[in-house]
Amino acid sequence: MTDLRSATGPYFGDFGGRYVPESLVAALDELAEAWEELKVDPAFIEELKELHRSYTGRPSLITEVPRFAEHAGGARIILKREDLNHTGSHKINNVLGQALLTKKIGKKRIIAETGAGQHGVATATAAALFGLDCVIYMGEVDTERQALNVARMRLLGAEVIPVRSGSRTLKDAINDAMRDWVTNVETTNYVFGTVAGPHPFPAMVRDLQKVIGEEAREQVLALTGRLPDAVAACVGGGSNAIGIFHAFLDDADVALYGFEAGGDGADTPRTAATITKGRPGMLHGARSYLLQDEDGQTIDSHSISAGLDYPGVGPEHSWLSDLGRASYRPVTDDQAMSALRLLSRTEGIIPAIESAHALAGALELGKELGPDSIILINLSGRGDKDMETAGKYFDLIDAGAEQS
C-alpha cells in the first residue's frame, strides 16, 4: 500500500485545494507558513504535549465494552474515550494547537464556527486560557437545540452570534465566520473546527487530531496483542474520524469505517450522508463530496445531531473513499438514538449523539465481522449537551418538570 499517512495537502487526490476570495489568500498563506514551521518546532511540540497532559487529560483511556458488544455479534468492542477530555470531546485537541499558534503569530482575537457547540466550547475555553478575545458563530437552529453549550461559551467569556441566514445551521455559521475573517484579518485568526475548508485547514486539523489514533494504536496493541480488524468513527466534517484513522492508514489489514448522518434515511431528502449520496463540488474553499441539486447548488442537510448536520465533508475523506481505503455508511437518526440508549444502559456511558452514529454502525459491523473480530470506536464526545434532545426523543422528562 502507498504511504497514505504522508499526504500533506493542499490536494488529496482530486480533492481539497484553496478556492477563496483574494482577500483571504494572504491570511491562509500566513497560517500555512506558521503551521509548517511550528509543527516541526520541538519547543512548540513540547508545549502542546504538556498542555494536553496537564489540561486536556491526555492520553485518553480506552475502555472495552463487553455488555454492549453482546449486541454486536460478540465482537470485541473497544472505545477510545475522547469523551473524557476536558470540555467533553475531541475538539480540544485541535483548538489548543490553533490557539497556541494564534499566540505565536501575535494575533489577539479568535473566531470559530460551531454546530453542536463542542468546538465553540473548546475554542472559548482556549481563549480564556490564553487571554484571547473570542467570537463564536452558531446557526440559530443549533443555538436552540444546544442551549447548554451556548451558556457554557458565554460563561467562558465568548460572544456567541446566532446566524439567521440560510438553513441557520453549521454551513451558514462557517459562511459568517469567513466574512468576519475577511474583514478583521489583521487582528483575527479563524480557529476552524474540522478537516474541511481551504488549505491548510484539512491538513493542520488532521495533524492536531492524529494524536487520537497514535495513542489508540499503542493502547489496543497493549491490551489485545494485535491491531483491530476495524476502526469506526462518525463523520460530519470528519476531524474525529481522520484523527483515529490516520495512525492505521498504512495498515492494510485494518478496515476503516466512517458512519455518516443518515437523518431520516439516506434515500430521503432529510439526510446528511454526504459521501453516500453526494458528488464532488466546491464548498467553503475546497473541492470535496457535497450534497447538491442538479444545478450544483448545495442543498440543506438534516441530522438529529447538530455536529453532523453538514452538507460537505473533509477532502481527505473524499479521497480515502475514492481510493477504497475507507468505507462510508449512513446511520439514521433512529439507529443512532437506539445505540445511544444501549451504551448508556449496558455500560453506564452516555455518548454524544454524533458518537452514537459510530456505535450504531459498529453494532452491524460486529455481526458482519464475527465474534473473533476487534472493533475500535472513537467515542468522540459525551452526551451531556444532548440531554434535552434525548429527553424529548425518549420521553424522559416529566410533564411540567423544569430542568435543573
Curated annotation (Swiss-Prot):
GO MF, one annotated term: tryptophan synthase activity
SUPFAM superfamilies the record matches: Tryptophan synthase beta subunit-like PLP-dependent enzymes
Enzyme kind, highest EC tier: lyase
E.C. code: 4.2.1.20
Domain of life: Bacteria
GO cellular component: cytoplasm
Pfam family, one: PALP
Sites bearing N6-(pyridoxal phosphate)lysine, chain numbering: K91
Reactions catalysed according to its record: (1S,2R)-1-C-(indol-3-yl)glycerol 3-phosphate + L-serine = D-glyceraldehyde 3-phosphate + L-tryptophan + H2O
Coiled coil: none
InterPro entries named among the record's database cross-references: Trp_synth_b_CS (IPR006653), Trp_synth_beta (IPR006654), Trp_synth_beta/beta-like (IPR023026), TrpB-like_PALP (IPR001926), TrpB-like_PALP_sf (IPR036052)
Cofactor(s) named in the record: pyridoxal 5'-phosphate
Alphabetical keyword list: Amino-acid biosynthesis, Aromatic amino acid biosynthesis, Lyase, Pyridoxal phosphate, Tryptophan biosynthesis
This protein's pathway: Amino-acid biosynthesis; L-tryptophan biosynthesis; L-tryptophan from chorismate: step 5/5
PROSITE patterns: TRP_SYNTHASE_BETA (PS00168)
The family this protein is said to belong to: Belongs to the TrpB family.
Functional summary from the UniProt entry: The beta subunit is responsible for the synthesis of L-tryptophan from indole and L-serine.
Listed NCBIfam families: trpB (TIGR00263)
Subunit text: Tetramer of two alpha and two beta chains.
Protein name, per record: Tryptophan synthase beta chain
